[in-house]
Amino acid sequence: MSLEKLIRPKSIAIVGVTDKLGFGRSAALSIVKSKETDRVYYVNPKREELFGRKCYKTIQEVPEVVDCVVVCTPRNVVPSVLKDSGELGTKAAVVYASGFAEEGTEEGTNLENQLIEISNTYDMKILGPNCMGLLNCIDKVNLWAGGSKWDLDTKKPGIGIVGQSGFITAEIVSSDYFNISYGFSTGNGNIVTLEDAVDFLVDDKYASVIAIYLEGLKNPQKFIDALKRAAQKRKPIIILKSGRSEKGAISAASHTGNLAGSSKAFESIFEKYGVISVENLEQFMCLAQAFSVLDGNLPTNSNFAAINFSGGENTICADLAEENGVELAEISSETKEEMKKYLPGFATPKNPLDATTALFHEKDMIVGLLHTFEKDDSVGFTMVGANIRDEENEMHETLCQAVSEARKQGLKKPVFAVPTLEGNRYLDYRTRLEDNQVPIMSSVGTTFTCFNKMAKFIDYDYSKRTLEFKAVKKRESNNVVALSELDSKIEMKKYGVPVPGQGNAKSIDELDEILKYIKYPVVLKINSSEILHKSDVGGVKIGIKNRDEAVDAYNEILTNVKKAKPDANIDGILVQEMVESGIEIIIGITNDDQFGPMLLVGLGGVFVEVFKDTTLYPLPINHDEAIMMLKKLKSFKLLNGYRGSKPCDIDALADMMVKLGKYAYENKDEVKEIDLNPVFVYPKGKGVCAVDALIVKYK
């Protein structure tokens, strides 16, 4: 979808201009202020002129076919305005009005459907309804409903904002804290979607970072295609996803379905494509502005040096760094010796550094320390403690001068100014620091959370990821059927997933035949696709050492199951080799409605839903990604050897994950869920074994 006429219109008509407070007034004033005024036209049938400009009675009277029509009328008038504009040949529109499909009424939905039909008929790109509009600071286009405060003369790369909440997006865009290049409020987003805006920003050179307030998706394929391109370009995307809390999938047929909800699915997509996911607006704005100011000059590694003016600040830095998984650089002895050249005699050269109150006024000391850390390869970036309040201050004047001088002398590594507390920042200091690629971060607590997220982006390597994505087909029905354990294991074995030796007995004679080739001890289990949790109905007997015990177990299982589940269809009794126990892991598949099959791995056995130590990842998956998943688990210590225990066969476990993922991805339109639980993981070199298996398919 080309958005050229919407984003860079040469001519604009504003329908519904008024001098009363509201969108019709603010849009009229801000658009005229931003554009060449002889190609902006007011339309109001009841007024001859407004704000010193002629008003046309209808869109047909406007002396040219405009590129974009901005509709400021009540909702019931919107379709006719758009239809008239479309018939003239206008190819873009912005609709601010609410009361359409978001209202949840038949009338509102019908009105929105009319807009969609008009868009299709006239090939018109309609932003909205129920939106705040569009801002393009690069080409001086202000179609934002809420004002005209932005610097529309910039040609500097900045932040591309996309939001699905009008109010939240307006708050973000209106902040003095942001260097904005573009702003999109997509509203209901059924015509020009959030995905369309992101797609544009990924390829635009003036959007150095993309910041998205995301509620949901219309087109997952287009969204992920854009994320993939951004990952390959190393363009940061920051997303604040709303609706992260979940009550769970009550009707899920397996453990995996219970654990994997839409919020986790989104987070797993973000991880795969290198998206920076944030939890609140403070992190969102802090990171977006930091990436914008750095403009591609990112740290070479995520270890940092800290320059503060008190021991208390150093203690806070050290604590927050450890809590957030951010590493203080292990500076070399040569670095420490060179630091002594610039520090007062009573200061100790170390990291974090208490530079004493000399930090307030010793410009040359700051310049020297920055260059010293520049030469130490262990240091990826430097942070300087600086409470840059909304007032002039000697310390911050010194810092501004020092950074400017250091940059002129060739300083390359990133520098961050880190206040202890949140607050307004003195504009002159902020401008001077940012001109020298020094972001002023948020409060120190938020800063270290942001450093952690920035470190993950720095360390992200798309070449180690499988970025392939194909959206699942829309299903007409979500009815499912569970395969029996026997059939599930047969499917798994075809893809090379190790399972125990097994057979299915429907009689004592068949039991005897199976016991001829499966050695004792054995396990007997009920084999029924209608009984998912066998132990709950007395359907499992383990440690069977001879034929007499096997016959007794066979009969007892049938008795137990018929009593607990009298209506269940029984396919027989599964006779299974009793394999040696190992560390119990669950590996599963859940098929997300938007993103398709995802692989889950975690601590397994009967406690899987108690501890919920799991991680989720989109398919397909390779060996490197499988290892990454395992390392995220709290229980990875058990796999890696803990308190004298032998390390487990992690490579074999990762190999099983890849094979299960291959099966699920190749059959994604058929498979809803899979549970391999437990999977026994043996010591290194001894392999793995899926002891139990459940596959749930769509009918």
Question: What is the role of each PLM region?
Answer:
Residues M1-D675, V679-K699:
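Catalytic-core regions of core metabolic enzymes
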